[in-house]
A protein has these predicted regions:
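Conserved RNA-binding domains used in RNP assembly and mRNA/RNA metabolism
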Residues: 1-81
Length: 81
């Protein structure tokens, strides 16, 4: 399931990726992760690594949201490149 994650310590950071919730901490796996920097423009996240997934604890996350259709389309295009 493709979702937005907004980080608690930086609510202006929107991460998008394939979200998997796990039973134990770290409780969230975000695969094929990108950061939305402005109106649907995606940047790879994290920077400076080939790793395209991140683990987050439940205390890192402010909220989880569904992306807008236009952003979802851009994400799917970016993942398939």
């Amino acid at each position: 399931v493709i979702k937005f994650i907004i980080l608690k310590n930086n609510p202006d950071t929107y991460l998008i990726g394939k979200l998997t919730e796990m039973d134990e901490e770290p409780s969230i796996l975000l695969e094929d992760s990108f950061r939305v920097v402005e109106e649907g423009l995606l940047k790879v996240y994290p920077l400076h690594t080939e790793q395209r997934f991140i683990f987050l604890t439940s205390t890192d996350v402010l909220t989880i949201l569904d992306p807008a259709p236009a952003v979802l389309a851009e994400y799917q295009k970016a993942v398939n490149e």
